[in-house]
């Protein structure tokens, strides 16, 4: 059961995660979840409200339960798509609770743009992106990520955060805003993961990427495939592996699917 799962997560030093769905006893289930996390000293992560159904609002229940229980370890919630199709007053109520509870939110524009409103033979009517601008105005720690990569949910992508930044700028209208959104791709995710913010000050780790661009428009206009990646002060080989070198990963996936069937 879930108790055994929580113990395994604790033994491996992981983060306790769950998917939330609307149900009558969700608040009670979440209280039990947070009690297990507290007893084991674990952070929490949720996959929530990845739907275009405005009646789905489990993010609000998560925030309320954090406030009720006083759970003080980091809590991260991904997707939260349904916020974008809810009545403005309802969404505002949820966002105020999220800010008060100090939740971290992760938006996944590429995958959610691809999956939401996907009905055969019809054109999608919305983008599937959560309310990132409204969150930032409230001081909520908002991050962006790629989510699925070349799997049954999203057959594309290459785990490239530059692609995520470039496409998220277009999808979520991150341009023409101040301050810039770079922190949502660097510092904010680090904060959500409990990592220290990196910088280029003397004594800091010399891990960074160099791009050929004189402005944001130049940076975003190209995929930056000629970037220079520096680790510990030295440029590393950035040659991408041939897809054939990755075939064993697909074989492992198929074998795992066969065994679980």
Regions found by a protein language model. Give the residues of each.
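Glycine/Thr-rich phosphate-binding loops of Rossmann-like dinucleotide-binding domains
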Residues: 26, 85, 114-115, 219
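Active-site proximal loops enriched in glycine and acidic residues that flank catalytic Cys/His/Asp
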Residues: 48-50, 79-81, 107-110, 144-148, ...
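His/Asp/Glu-enriched, well-ordered alpha-helical/loop segment
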Residues: 43, 64-75, 115, 126-213
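Positions that flank functional sites
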Residues: 24, 52, 112-113, 150-151
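Active-site clefts of carbohydrate-active enzymes
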Residues: 104, 111-113, 117-118
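Histidine/acidic residue-rich metal-binding segments in metalloenzymes
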Residues: 1-104, 121-144, 198
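Short Asp/Glu-rich motifs
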Residues: 28, 55-56, 117-118, 154-155, ...
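Active-site microenvironment of metallo-dependent hydrolases
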Residues: 166, 179-261
């Amino acid at each position: 059961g879930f108790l055994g799962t929580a113990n395994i997560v604790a033994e491996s030093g992981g983060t306790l995660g769950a998917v939330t769905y609307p149900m009558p006893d969700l608040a009670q289930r979440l209280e039990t979840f947070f009690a297990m996390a507290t007893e084991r000293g674990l952070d929490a992560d949720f996959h929530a409200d990845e739907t275009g159904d405005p009646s789905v609002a489990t993010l609000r229940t998560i925030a309320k339960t954090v406030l009720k229980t006083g759970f003080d370890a980091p809590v991260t919630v991904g997707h939260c798509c349904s916020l974008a199709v809810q009545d403005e007053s309802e969404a505002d109520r949820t966002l105020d609770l999220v800010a008060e509870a100090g939740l971290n939110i992760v938006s996944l524009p590429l995958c959610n743009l691809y999956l939401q409103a996907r009905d055969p033979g019809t054109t999608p009517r919305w983008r599937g992106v959560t309310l990132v601008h409204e969150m930032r105005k409230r001081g909520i720690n908002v991050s962006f990520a790629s989510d699925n990569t070349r799997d049954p949910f999203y057959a594309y992508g290459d785990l490239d955060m530059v692609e995520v930044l470039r496409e998220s700028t277009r999808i979520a209208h991150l341009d023409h805003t101040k301050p810039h959104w770079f922190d949502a791709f660097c510092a904010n995710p680090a904060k959500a993961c409990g990592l220290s913010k990196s910088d280029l000050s003397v004594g800091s780790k010399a891990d960074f990427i160099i791009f050929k661009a004189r402005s944001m428009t130049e940076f975003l206009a190209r995929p930056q495939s000629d970037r220079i990646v520096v680790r510990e002060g030295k440029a590393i080989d950035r040659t991408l592996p041939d897809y054939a070198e990755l075939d064993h990963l697909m074989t492992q996936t198929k074998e795992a699917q066969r065994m679980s069937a």
